[in-house]
Amino acid sequence: MKTLYISDMDGTLLNDGGKVNELIKNGMLFTVATARSAISAAELLKDIDISVPAVLMNGVFLFDLKNKKAVAYHEIPKDAFFAITEIFVRRNKSPFVFFYGDDGKFTIEYTDFKLPIHRDFYEKRKGKFFGEFKKVSEYEILDDMHPVFISLSDGYDELKPIYDAAQKTDGVTCSFYADTYTPYWFLEIYSSKASKANGAQEVMALVGADKIAAFGDNRNDILLFSLADRKYAVKNAVPELRQIADEVIGENNNDGVAEFLKKDFKA
């Protein structure tokens, strides 16, 4: 029986890559499932030798981190794209809209920086990824580009009405949850065909695994847990996830996932 070990990143993994690498060298099937894009995930995971496709942007992408290319992806339907961006614009919000090009590069559209964290997002990534930011007067679908992800960080009260309205749009899934690192919340919108759970199933089929052992910390890991044969919440996970976990393991700051894998994996 082959087990695919699949972990969230923020608040769950992101600490000691060396311990995980040793297990991968010994044959462990390991990857990540995260809301992060290929842009930030590739940089943060550069010290972990992941050869199994990663599930990125909540399942929008199956992504080959080594070769920096998509194995598969789900795009937002055109009608849904314009309906969603209009909801944001009516409330004077400027989300970051991710496009994946036929050339394998990303374009991120935005109209303005409404909060310092939005400029910070831009500054930390500008010139550091395989693609470009594009400031626009209004959101548009560019030639040979496919809309895949719409994201905004803001206060709960600012985002909740947008979340409620966006959920009524066909063809998309809305993920709304608290940020691990700041007092803000994330609203992420993407194709309804995508989810961490669906992505995990696709990876499972690609690598010929029989079972999934999942690790997470936040509400956006609940669907992944519903699919997993074994599910483990780190000690710092939200109560909702700890309640449905088979076991609560060490917190992320103490390398909870890596330490668990060392004990659990048998080459």
Kindly label every feature range from the protein language model.
Residues 8:
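Active-site residues of response regulator receiver
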Residues 16-121:
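Active-site phosphate-binding/coordination module
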Residues 13-28, 73-80, 135, 191-206, ...:
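Short, acidic loop-to-helix structural element flanking the phosphoryl-transfer center
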Residues 26, 48-50, 58, 168-170, ...:
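Short, structured coil segments at secondary-structure junctions
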Residues 105-215, 219:
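Conserved acidic, metal-coordinating active-site core of Asp-based
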Residues 26-31, 51-52, 148-149, 210-211, ...:
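Short active-site oxyanion
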Residues 51-57, 174-175, 231-235, 249-251:
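Short hydrophobic/aromatic-enriched beta-strand-loop microsegments
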Residues 1-4, 15, 186-267:
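Mg2+-dependent phosphoryl-transfer enzymes with acidic/Ser/Thr/Gly-rich catalytic loops
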